[in-house]
């Protein structure tokens, strides 16, 4: 059965898309730690990120870099942090999180509740910065 993230890529489940190329897809995390929290995934369905081939892992990181630079332009911050957990969704993903402090990377923090309009605005600001 397809993962929830493959269903998002296929358009079967809605998302707030940030960017896409032939191999990778970026969209807003639905339970963001901060505004601009974005997920980057390979379209290839792989659970563990370190099971990707060397070439695909490198290409995913280059794609994530473009998205991260755009997040930093759209949401001024000290740096955009990157994290890989993958304990909840069995489809490899990189979290990109604009940080004002180390505390912004604590996954145990309460998540933001944003309206659809806010999500739409955030996604378009990042897309426009790409
Ligand atoms: P992890 O697997 O890295 O522990 O966490 C998975 C992340 O995916 C979480 O931050 C969660 O909010 C996000 N997530 C889970 N399901 C969905 C979904 O259906 N749509 C979006 N946009 N994000 C999701």
Per-range role (PLM):
Residues 1-130:
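HIT superfamily nucleotide-processing domains
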């Amino acid at each position: 059965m397809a993962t929830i993230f493959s269903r998002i890529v296929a358009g079967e489940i809605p998302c707030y898309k940030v960017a896409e190329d032939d191999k990778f897809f970026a969209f807003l995390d639905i339970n963001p730690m901060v505004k601009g929290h974005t997920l980057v995934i390979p379209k290839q369905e792989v659970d563990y990120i370190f099971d990707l081939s060397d070439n695909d892992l490198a290409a995913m990181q280059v794609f994530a870099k473009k998205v991260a630079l755009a997040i930093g332009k759209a949401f001024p911050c000290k740096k955009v942090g990157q994290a890989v957990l993958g304990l909840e969704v069995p489809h490899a993903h990189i979290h990109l999180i604009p940080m004002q402090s180390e505390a912004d990377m604590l996954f145990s923090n309460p998540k933001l509740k944003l309206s659809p309009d806010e999500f739409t605005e955030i996604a378009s600001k990042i897309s426009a910065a790409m």
